[in-house]
Amino acid sequence: MVKPRLVFLSIAGPKDEQLYLEIIDPKEKHLLARYQYLGELSLDVINDLVNDGERTSNDCFLGLLGVEEDISTYAFYSNTKVKFILAVKAPDYVVKETEIRQLLRRIYTIHTHAVCNPFSMDLTPETLKTSIYFKESLHQLISDWNIH
């Protein structure tokens, strides 16, 4: 049985602008267009979920958005309307949503610390790409999760 592994992380701003996209496995960089497409599809699902008038839950974790072949996408929607999309490849393994929920909350915390840095005056989409704290913390979190 092949254990699950993270495929990509996408972070989108309040207006669905892409703030960050990280393809976890460097060998899959050639699949950038596919992962961008999955991220865009996920944004449509997120917007449908959060704009649903019947939605009663205030939980930021939106859960499983969809499955494309062997890649499952999950989402977290912050109170500032920042969207976190995480894709997991799990061909023969059931991924526990509680694990994904915890992982997305930790990513959200890392993101918050990076963009709320009082010493950084530059809060643009480049903030995450240039933040050493964000990159190192995220890479450590991802490597820990992939080997658990």
Curated annotation (Swiss-Prot):
InterPro entries: Longin-like_dom_sf, Sedlin
One cellular component term from this protein's GO annotations in UniProt: nucleus
One protein family per Pfam: Sedlin_N
Gene Ontology biological process terms, A to Z: endoplasmic reticulum to Golgi vesicle-mediated transport
Protein name: Uncharacterized protein C15A10.12c
